[in-house]
C-alpha cells in the first residue's frame, strides 16, 4: 500500500524483504497485517515453508523491476544462503564471501540483463564484463563489448575464484561452454 501511493513511496529508499517470501511450493508466506502479532508469533500459527534460490531471486528481481530507483535487500528466511539470488536479481547488500577485490569493484557497476530462460541469470557492464549464475550444463552466447577477458569460475558455496582462461579476445560475444553449474565471471581486462 505504501509503495503504490506516490506521496508515501517518495520517502522510501530501501525495500526490505523480511517478513514475507515465496515458498518452494509456489505459495506465498505473508502474515496478515494488523493482527498485533510479532513475526515469531505468526510463524507459530502459519507454516512458514521453505524459500529456495529461485524464490529469493524472483522476489528481489520483481521489486527491482517495479521500483528501479529503490534499493532492495532480502533478509527473509535463511537470507545468508541466498546471496547469489540477491546479487543476480539486482538487489543490494548480498551476503557473499568473494575475496577478489576486482570482482567486488566490478559488480556494483553491473546491471541485470534480462534473459528468456531459467538456465541462468546474468548481470553485466560494458567496462566490467559479465557474471552468470548457471543452473544447467549448456552453451551460452554472452554478449560482450569487444576486448580482452579472463574467464573465471566462482564456487557458489565457498566463493573461491579460479581462472579457467586467463586471456581471451572477444568480438561482440563469447561462447561459454558450461561444464559445471555455478557462477562464471567474464572479467574485462
Over which residues does each language-model region extend?
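Glycine- and acidic/polar-rich repeat regions and solenoidal domains
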Residues: 16, 21-53
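Short strand-edge motifs at loop-to-beta-strand transitions and within beta-strands
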Residues: 172-174
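Short acidic-hydrophobic, aromatic-tinged amphipathic segments that line or gate anion-handling sites
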Residues: 168
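Aromatic- and carboxylate-lined catalytic core of secreted/periplasmic carbohydrate-active enzymes
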Residues: 40-52, 58-73, 79-165, 177-189
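Substrate-binding cleft/loops of secretory-pathway carbohydrate-active enzymes
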Residues: 1-29, 80-91
